Amino acid sequence: MLTTEKYQGLNWSKNHGLIPAIIQHSISGEVLMLGYMNQESMAITEKTGYVTFFSRSKNRLWIKGESSGNVLKLINWYPDCDFDSLLILVLPQGFTCHKNTNSCFHPALTDFSFLFQLENIISIKKNHTSSHGNQQSSYTSDLYTSGIERIAQKVGEEGLETALAAVSRNSKSLIDEASDLIYHLLVLLQHESLNFHDVIQELRVRSKLKKKH
């Protein structure tokens, strides 16, 4: 984590007291935007936990989301090797871009960013089904209406079909079945108020444990 002592040691002389800051989604890895910060905006960001920039066009401090409410919650930040730019990891609330897209670089999605968006769509369908019933019938909504037993059954079925496709050495079939398995696994995780990020964190822990032994 970048502390006050460390950010005061950044190279502020290169760009007239400003540092370019790359904003990245802390879970999906999607690059959201580029902004500029001075020492005052960094101090406010550290104090409030929400990203504040220095606007070059307005010539003042600018809290991201001050008018739209689409703020950027600070998760972590890192200087680059030359200490003249920043990578800031955030959890965005709402759209980041003023054009109502998740990223100002839309639609430059990485593979994992797509997976994160798919998970968000599944979550929306789950919440809508929970609060309004299955008014807008879809396969995902039908699964949530059926309940955990049906969802778990589908994960088991798709897992078996994935294994059989692998044994048959059919690459196309394996990709198809693995896609079905991952989709139904995401549905299951969302049903239990979990997500793929939780799985990744567990894998990180296991990886660290293996390195120690």
Curated annotation (Swiss-Prot):
Highest taxon above the source species: Bacteria
Predominant localisation class: cytoplasm
Extract the InterPro entries matched here.
His_synth_HisIE, HisE, PRib-ATP_PPHydrolase-like, PRib_AMP_CycHydrolase_dom, PRib_AMP_CycHydrolase_sf
- GO MF: ATP binding; phosphoribosyl-AMP cyclohydrolase activity; phosphoribosyl-ATP diphosphatase activity
EC number from the UniProt entry: 3.5.4.19, 3.6.1.31
Which Pfam families does the annotation name? Answer: PRA-CH (PF01502), PRA-PH (PF01503)
Biological or metabolic pathway of the protein: Amino-acid biosynthesis; L-histidine biosynthesis; L-histidine from 5-phospho-alpha-D-ribose 1-diphosphate: step 2/9; Amino-acid biosynthesis; L-histidine biosynthesis; L-histidine from 5-phospho-alpha-D-ribose 1-diphosphate: step 3/9
- For region Phosphoribosyl-ATP pyrophosphohydrolase, the annotated ranges are 115-213
Catalysed reactions, as listed in the record: 1-(5-phospho-beta-D-ribosyl)-ATP + H2O = 1-(5-phospho-beta-D-ribosyl)-5'-AMP + diphosphate + H(+); 1-(5-phospho-beta-D-ribosyl)-5'-AMP + H2O = 1-(5-phospho-beta-D-ribosyl)-5-[(5-phospho-beta-D-ribosylamino)methylideneamino]imidazole-4-carboxamide
> Where does the record place it?
Cytoplasm
Annotated family: In the N-terminal section; belongs to the PRA-CH family. In the C-terminal section; belongs to the PRA-PH family.
Protein name per UniProt: Histidine biosynthesis bifunctional protein HisIE
Q: Which gene encodes it?
A: hisI
